[in-house]
Amino acid sequence: LLPKNINKSERRPVVVCQHGLEGRPQDLADTNNETPAYHRYACRLADLGYIVFAPQKPYIGADNFRRLQRLANPLKLSLFSFITRQHQRILQWLSSLAEVDAQRIAFYGLSYGGKTAMRVPALLEEYCLSICSADYNEWIWKNASAHHKYSYLLTGEYEMPEFNLGNTFNYAEMSWLICPRPFMVERGHHDGVAPDEWVAYEYARTYRRYVELGLADK
């Protein structure tokens, strides 16, 4: 999406907006498609003057994409191995456009797009900031708890456990890889992702790192 009245010599910031599980770019970037989760947020960003790009990602098709994850794992890969490569190409292409300010390309993902907001900008420094919406979590509890209704053990999303992730990176550690770039968590008290206590516990570790570096305002 391009905002109106971009001057020929002007370079605008870009927001890459990422849909969630079983989603389509139209869910967030179609002016005629109002959904309760997305509220056309990509369109609203374009109205504010940002260039917006909403790519399609592979986490769609129920077990079809989950089989892709299982085929990738023995090769020491995951679904995000492919998604990260997609974003490398996206960043290269966006940076080549005359109307784009390549130093101000941001990432904003919701739900499964929020998972992408944690993992991809941590690896690709070309993203100047990241917004994780409706996903930030205490990831070990989210995957391993047999007692809480928020746990993936109680859903059909069997691709969620990622080898050795709990032993290496929880969400706070991923955010530290995004630091010192700005980072934001967006969530609702009743969004069904996790209880407030889980998110507050993990986010406190994220915020402490920014405070220690004198970056609390980011």
Q: For each predicted feature, which ranges?
A:
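Cap/lid segment of the alpha/beta-hydrolase catalytic domain
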Residues: E10-S96, K142-A146
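Alpha/beta-hydrolase-fold catalytic nucleophile elbow
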Residues: Q56, Y108, S133-A134, E186
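Short beta-strand/loop motif that positions the catalytic acidic residue
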Residues: I178, V185-R187
